[in-house]
Structures are given as structure tokens and as C-alpha cells.
Amino acid sequence: MSPTPDKQANADAPVAVAPAPGPVSQWLSQQGFEHELLEPDHVGVEQIAVEALFLPVIAAALKSHGFDYLQCQGGYDEGPGERLVCFYHLLAMAEVAEGSADQVREVRLKVFLSREGQPSVPSLYGLFRGADWQERETFDMFGIQFEGHPHPKRLLMPEDWTGWPLRKDYVQPDFYEMQDAY
């Protein structure tokens, strides 16, 4: 008996295969940290999703494991009605500087947030001082609050600006007049 067209189409459909755990994901699992493995980025950097609550603990563990440099922190919007994403890209720079490694190890931590209400993530400013202005910019452009940040103010937009300009559902005002001349 020949398969029906629906069954034939399903048989030809590609099967989604989970990415193989990279070295950082394996290490986190050995340490008992819950996380979700994501596909590596376009250049092969390991990407890991973590819950906002566990971000500081996992980041501190990674720092003690050699990831001593915050290359960048940022955010992006997956689209109207979708999630906001906060990410931290960490490097293990000291290993290369000391000569104990030939190549820099990299990992990107991602926190997926609902756009409803007030999305928030614990600040990593206390762990990586370089997160200061980067977290402020992410707040300014996407409205993601960073709990525990010492200067939770807008960085680029005027203090009285309404909305978050890099959200994909942002509606630009017709007119804005600066109140203070510089």
C-alpha cells in the first residue's frame, strides 16, 4: 500500500536536531546549573539561554571559570508580540594573555523576557564594571530594567522621553521639543 500524500510529506520533512552541547554548556551542566542550549551563532559562538533569576550566579561561575571579560551587553526585539532578549557576550581573555590558550573562548548568555509589564534582569555591573553604560543603553532603547544597577537612567534619550525606540512596536512621536538647550 502506498503512503498517502500527507504521510509522504511528513516523511520527507527535516527532523529538528538539538545542537550538541559545547564545552561551556557541558561545564555548566557538571556544576548543576540549569540552562538551555541554543544554536551557535553564525561564527560558531556557543549561545546559552538562562533564566533572569540565575543570570548573576551563572555569570559569576563563568567568571571564576575564566570568562573574565564582558565584550558586550545588549538587547534586541524578536518582533511585535514576541519576546525581548537581553544578552551578555563573555570572553576568556586572561588565558590568551598568559599564554595558556591559543584561542579566546567565547560564550553568549541570553535571557528571554516577556515584553508585557516591566521586563527586568539583575544587573551584572557588580561583576563586570563595563556593563554600566551598556545596560543603561539597553534600558534606554528597549525598556529592560536592570535590578541593582547604580545609575538606572536613560543614556541616549532625554529623561522625559516616552517609549523605547528600538522596540519593533515603537511608534515615533510626530514632534519632540528639547526643554533644555545645551
From Swiss-Prot:
The keyword NADP applies. It catalyses: a plastoquinone + NADH + (n+1) H(+)(in) = a plastoquinol + NAD(+) + n H(+)(out); a plastoquinone + NADPH + (n+1) H(+)(in) = a plastoquinol + NADP(+) + n H(+)(out). PROSITE patterns: COMPLEX1_30K. Keywords: Membrane, NAD, NADP, Plastoquinone, Quinone, Thylakoid, Translocase, Transport. It is a peripheral membrane protein. It comes from the Bacteria. GO terms for cellular component: plasma membrane-derived thylakoid membrane. It is an enzyme of class 7 (translocase). Pfam families: Complex1_30kDa (PF00329). InterPro entries: NADH_DH_suC, NADH_quin_OxRdtase_su_C/D-like, NADH_UbQ_OxRdtase_30kDa_su, NADH_UbQ_OxRdtase_CS. One of its GO terms (molecular function) is quinone binding. Its main location: membrane. GO terms for biological process: photosynthesis, light reaction. Its EC number is 7.1.1.-. It is found in: Cellular thylakoid membrane. Belongs to the complex I 30 kDa subunit family. NDH-1 shuttles electrons from an unknown electron donor, via FMN and iron-sulfur (Fe-S) centers, to quinones in the respiratory and/or the photosynthetic chain. The immediate electron acceptor for the enzyme in this species is believed to be plastoquinone. Couples the redox reaction to proton translocation, and thus conserves the redox energy in a proton gradient. Cyanobacterial NDH-1 also plays a role in inorganic carbon-concentration. NDH-1 can be composed of about 15 different subunits; different subcomplexes with different compositions have been identified which probably have different functions. This is NAD(P)H-quinone oxidoreductase subunit J.
